[in-house]
């Protein structure tokens, strides 16, 4: 999405990005400064894509009566390692989606990819480097390295998350109530984050 031309940065990192002193996401991450403005992501990742995973109507009873809001769950990514998941609520669907997109941008992370399948030795970053598992609520998702050309063997929600992260080939195992789109997406996103927990050997690192 295009960033607002009238954006006035309020954070130190935002000012550095606006001044051109930080010109890439790699530099932003290495700076150690928190990303608190979605416009930073708009400027550093102009090819970022977003997709709505789920929209639910939630209700809450108050003293003044029943309050109804819409909860939107959105995934963003550039299909090349950067991916973020966000959710937000609002009384209208449109604002809920926009808030969820901003939340996903602020939660964006870089996922290391590799060629971790014993059936493949291409050395390209097309799958996860090793088996990882993520959990959210009752849902558990395990990502298993797959050979190049297999594709994504996963449910619809998990596939959307993995595609935005740039994963092209992977086996998956799921447990729990995967009909819950929110927890299914969160568990898949958590599994991707587990890749960054372990230190990667040299042969698993992506090409520059």
UniProtKB/Swiss-Prot annotation:
Segments forming domain S5 DRBM: 48-111
Top-level lineage group: Archaea
Sample GO molecular function, one term: structural constituent of ribosome
UniProt xrefs under InterPro entries: Ribosomal_Su5_D2-typ_SF, Ribosomal_uS5, Ribosomal_uS5_arc, Ribosomal_uS5_C, Ribosomal_uS5_euk/arc, Ribosomal_uS5_N, Ribosomal_uS5_N_CS, Ribsml_uS5_D2-typ_fold_subgr
UniProt keyword list: Ribonucleoprotein, Ribosomal protein, RNA-binding, rRNA-binding
GO cellular component: cytosolic small ribosomal subunit
Keyword Cell inner membrane tagged: no
Alphabetical GO biological process terms: translation
Presence of keyword RNA-binding: yes
Similarity field: Belongs to the universal ribosomal protein uS5 family.
Domain statement: The N-terminal domain interacts with the head of the 30S subunit; the C-terminal domain interacts with the body and contacts protein S4. The interaction surface between S4 and S5 is involved in control of translational fidelity.
Subunit and interaction comment: Part of the 30S ribosomal subunit. Contacts protein S4.
UniProt-listed HAMAP family: Ribosomal_uS5_A
Function: With S4 and S12 plays an important role in translational accuracy.
Protein name: Small ribosomal subunit protein uS5
Organism of provenance: Methanosarcina barkeri (strain Fusaro / DSM 804)
Gene: rps5
């Amino acid at each position: 999405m295009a960033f607002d031309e009238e954006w006035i940065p309020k954070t130190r990192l935002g000012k550095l990005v606006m001044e051109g002193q930080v010109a890439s996401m790699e530099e932003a991450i290495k700076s150690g400064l928190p990303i608190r403005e979605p416009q930073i992501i708009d400027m550093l990742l102009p090819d970022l894509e977003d997709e709505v995973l789920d929209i639910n109507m939630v209700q809450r009873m108050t003293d003044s009566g029943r309050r109804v809001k819409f909860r939107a769950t959105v995934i963003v990514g550039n299909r090349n390692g950067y991916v973020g998941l966000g959710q937000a609520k609002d009384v209208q669907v449109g604002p809920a989606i926009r808030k969820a997109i901003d939340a996903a941008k602020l939660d964006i992370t870089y996922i290391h990819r590799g060629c971790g399948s014993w059936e493949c030795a291409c050395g390209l970053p097309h799958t996860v480097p090793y088996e990882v598992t993520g959990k959210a609520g009752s849902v558990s998702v395990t990502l298993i390295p797959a050979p190049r050309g297999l594709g994504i063997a996963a449910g619809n929600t998990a596939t959307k998350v993995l595609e935005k992260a740039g994963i092209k080939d992977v086996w998956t195992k799921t447990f729990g109530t995967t009909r819950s789109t929110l927890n299914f997406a969160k568990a898949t996103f958590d599994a991707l984050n587990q890749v960054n927990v372990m230190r990667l050997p040299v042969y698993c690192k992506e090409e520059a």
